[in-house]
Amino acid sequence: MDKYESDSFRSTFMFREIMEEPETITNTVNSVISDVLRAVNLIKKSKITYVVGSGTSYHAAMIMQIGMLKAGLPAIAVRSSEFSYFTPPDNVGIVVVLISQSGESKDIKDALNLCLKNGYHTIGITNSPKSSISTGTEVSVVTVAGEERSLAATKSHVAQLIVSYLLVSSLNDHGKIEDYIEKCIGIASRIKEIIDRNKDYSDLARGITGRIVFLGDGTLHAEAMEGALKFEETANMITEAYPLGEYLHGPIQVLRGDDTVIILKGRDSREYERLILRLSNFTKNIITIGKGKEFTIPIPECEIEDLDPILYVIPIQILANFKTVCLGLDPDKPTRLTKVVK
């Protein structure tokens, strides 16, 4: 990699904003606690919680849903554009968490208006304190990611995941909020470790070819979907995302020799070894992300499983940025997309 290419990789707003993620976590954690606790009190009184978002925000909603279900709280993650199909006529005990970076996209505002019409309780999680979602919900949790000049959401997504962790952990009542704050601050240093190894990703990015298949289980399935979206948004590449075991139920049939498979290996990925053996029969272009030196991209250890999605998504963001630059494209300004979908 020559100096020009190296500088190009790192001169994008997308990469600079990835670099700001440790600071984003610290600033957000120090800012949102009182509002998170207000949201917790509202959810504790509910019968069911809907978590609504679009694109990257929907992937954060999926992770929040899993956390709430593990805590014994009924929850459903719904895409903003689909929310009207899920709304029950009974408004008693309904809480809707609306997640949006901008707080101004048409679909999320339509979802809020439907909540207000039906009398649902509402919680907003945005990066924009003066947005329609922030000002129109009962409880507003504002992340402190700062302005995102790249169209691809990176640091705002990490901030959403931190808020999700704080909220779900507080609902669990397994510890004091101060303990959760300390764990969040600790994850910032782990992120810095991953970012500091970004030079390792340039050759990997260059070798990504064909269609990209992202595989992950549980919360890492949500981040597999996020990885697929990032490469579609920035690098114009065709992608898919599946749970590990599900990929063997049909989709593997169309895997080609020049396709790339990126596997997010979690703590309980039971299908991992079997899947690697099967995949290696059809493509040699396999990138693994996990905890241990045997993985293509090793992730630092983290004692809190609920924070794993943050660590796994960082290298994917970096790979997407690097691959896009390799292709001669601008990850900050995809030609058909806008930051706020009207």
Language model features: what each stretch is:
Residues 208-273, 278, 282-285:
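Acidic catalytic cores of enzymes that act on phosphate-bearing nucleotides/polynucleotides
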Residues 32-192, 217, 252, 260-304, ...:
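Glycine-rich phosphate-binding loops that contact phosphosugars or nucleotide phosphates
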Residues 3-47, 189-196:
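An N-terminal, well-structured beta->alpha segment
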Residues 2-23, 123, 147-156, 302-313:
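A cross-family phosphate/adenosyl-ligand binding-site feature
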